[in-house]
Amino acid sequence: MRTFASTAPKDSFINVLNLRSSLSIWKNFCQPSENIPKELSRVSVKICRTVFTSEVVVWYMPPSWVQRNPQPRTIIEAAQLAIQVTDIGEVRHFMPHSQIPLIVHQTWSHRQIDTWPDDLRQSVEKWLQFVVEDEMAYFLWEDEGMVEFIDHFEPQAHDYYSSLPLMVEKTDYFRITVATCVGGIYGDLDTVPLKPPAQWITSQDVRPWTDLETRSVYNSMKPVRALFGIEADCLPTDHTCWRMGYPYSIQLTQWSFASARDYPLLHQYIENLAHQLQKIANHHGGLQTSAARTELQALDPLTLTGPEAVTRAAQEWLNTSAGLRWNALTGLHDGGKAKLVDDVLILPITSFSPGRGKYGNMGSKPITDPTALVHHHGQGS
């Protein structure tokens, strides 16, 4: 059931999706098409005929997830159902070798897809193809839907969320929050999955590995509970990372990542941000004062909420939980291998940042490489 949330009556669904004849995303997923298997076409038709009203946002729940449960009427009910279904712990609801649920989250300001650039529509189409084929849940969160989610699942965070001056910062914060509360896979709308998320973790990825400098061996037998890719992979001694604008020699992506619900590393990110915002609030008598807003506007989003903030949280958590030497994660000396640290899987740069050019390549292989999983069109944010 894909739901196009709207305050309008169900009949308006045809108006909302009157774009099907011109937009391949809806052509492929809302009517039979010779370009996709008949089995997928039949499922897609069923999806698009099942419509419920809601205030915001769009979602899809596999039929097998709702067979024994009341049909969700709102995005919040759908998220609660996703939590309920995956809490049962059936293996088919999770990525292999992990406790990460097969739930995809994406964000965008609105669902007027006729105004979206072609590349965004094509990216979402690819995500939806894998979602339907592998019986995954899918959520597209609009701006209003993000506020609704925060107010329902994390009401104590409303002031922090609303104080962030830029929408990109709110989106950064939301992706971590929704992964914390629901779990799943996050992908920016301008990311294209090159492989289905159900195939992202292989038995090769969770094998033991050795820190080549300290000779420490990491041989965790735990299921993966968080998964991140590398955005920057530089030798800490040659200052390449600084020349390219990266404060960390090993910096993680946050245009795509995956996590089990309620994972401590994500809590570390949230606590770091809350501490920084509370410090500003204490200094200026609240977060809504003009002085507080001025200070917040002067902060770099990449540092406050973006990949630098994610990297900092991961570095702190993995140092505490596993004593990790951060630069041991480099793939420059082993051809780019995945590394499991405790229950966090760090994928090489090619996985989420393949196809980089000669400058700033950092070991990135072509998008055709078997380890390439996601292609980010906004690469280098």
Predicted regions mapped to residue ranges:
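Small-residue hinge/turn detector
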Residues: 173-184
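Glycosyltransferase-associated regions of secretory-pathway enzymes
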Residues: 1-171, 187-381
